[in-house]
Amino acid sequence: MGLGNPGRRYALTRHNAGHMVLDELFRRHGGRWRRARRAEAAEVSVEGREAVLLKPATFMNESGEALSGYRAEDLIVVHDDLDLPAGTVRVKVGGGAGGHNGLRSVISRVGNGFVRVRVGIGRPPEGADVTGYVLGRMDRAAREAIPRAADAVEAVLEEGPEAAMNRFNARA
């Protein structure tokens, strides 16, 4: 599941990092987008492993609404993360929402035992509005992380979460 907001207005914003990563995975693996319950979905095959790319058609704070029938242990949730420097990609299993309303919605629907691929967008400048920042256009460093985040999703699918964490969470 890639977190983001629907519509062109939000397509290139920091908060839509999850949608952008799913678009990259779709580009790599093909498939066909279809309308699903409160989401767009595409079935893809990654190294022989079947996966569903799911982009909620709801706004961020209602993302969990698209998860009817899904279990936490079957999910990889890709999202923007203010607490990581722009361009950083990290993999994590479990945890809290950390102030992220999309994650809060997902956790309220399925619990917190899912894998996360976190795309760092950095913090806004001192005194700047956080909402305006996350809904602002993604900067170059964060954009360049999108293919690496797609690599991280593929690694989780191919090698498992622990191997993906070892690979993507290592300090350079």
Swiss-Prot record:
For this protein, what is any one GO molecular function term? tRNA binding
Signal sequence extent: none
Stabilizes the basic form of H active site to accept a proton (site feature) positions: 80
Q: What is its main location?
A: cytoplasm
Give the catalytic activity.
an N-acyl-L-alpha-aminoacyl-tRNA + H2O = an N-acyl-L-amino acid + a tRNA + H(+)
- Catalytic residue list: 15 (proton acceptor)
- Where, by residue number, does the polypeptide cross the bilayer? none
Q: Which domain of life is it from?
A: Bacteria
Subunit structure comment from the entry? Monomer.
What does the similarity note say? Answer: Belongs to the PTH family.
Database matches in PANTHER family = PEPTIDYL-TRNA HYDROLASE
| Job of this protein | Hydrolyzes ribosome-free peptidyl-tRNAs (with 1 or more amino acids incorporated), which drop off the ribosome during protein synthesis, or as a result of ribosome stalling. Catalyzes the release of premature peptidyl moieties from peptidyl-tRNA molecules trapped in stalled 50S ribosomal subunits, and thus maintains levels of free tRNAs and 50S ribosomes.
What is the protein name stated in its UniProt record?
Peptidyl-tRNA hydrolase
Organism (species):
Rubrobacter xylanophilus (strain DSM 9941 / JCM 11954 / NBRC 16129 / PRD-1)
